[in-house]
Amino acid sequence: MSNDRPMEPSIASAAQLAKLLRATGYLADDALATIGFLALRLGRPLLLEGEPGTGKTALAEALAEALDLPLIRLQCYEGIDASQALYDWDFPRQILHLRALETTARIGEGGDGADGPDVEKSLFDERFLLARPILRALRESPAVLLVDEVDRADDEFEAFLLEVLSTYQVTIPELGTIRATVPPIVILTSNRTRELHDALKRRCLYHWIDHPGLARELEIVRSRAPEVGERLSRQVVSAVQAMRRGDDLVKPPGVAETLDWARALMELGASDLDVEHASATLGVAVKYREDADRVRASLDTILGA
């Protein structure tokens, strides 16, 4: 049974959400603000896909800050399974506890430490439970749960996620069923290294995030790196936009690289992005040797864009 619920009416419109996000330094366009607002109002997970560096993870961070909620992050990777997302038992502490019970039983000639069922019950007490991100999000809600790079996980983990997101509850055999009093706000991100299953997509609202255009990216730099001069900011953003227009880079720079590049140039005292400064700091913007070689070979064209 679905546990969807509309969010409390604290955010009345997409425009209000965009304003709250802007106050954290995150500039959402109208489409993203609208789908984010609908996800909050309808109580549905939001799946964000896009190239690396387009601000998918940053949206979850900004949303948690804007709503004054804890951010709980589940970083997906190849081979992740349900136990690594849900919970585990603190085995070393359980062993110490068991030894303490045995010692108590010997000294007291019986007592609680000698009772088998009681021993087992005490071993699987909540004090020995290691809550992983999903269980934490269910127990600590309201919270923002970020399931980052879900495309790196496998089909089995996707099926597990779908079940959790359908019920917002998990069952721990030794403790029973744990339900979220208020379901967490769930943001899933994917770099689309593989296609996600339709069942998971149907469960979520969906939005593709593109790299920002020149005007919006310049606005982001002004907001996030106000210490960088206007002229240098424009030159950096123009250069990054030119790099992205080509289709020959392994990984075009994202917004994070734009910000880092602008700040790095400022630290070097550069007031203009010329060929010398660009070549010396290229490793801030591009992270593959072949990309650096291609960009360096065409810097005159890129800087003149």
Where are these regions (language model features)?
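C-terminal regulatory/interaction module of P-loop NTP-utilizing enzymes
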Residues: M1-A305
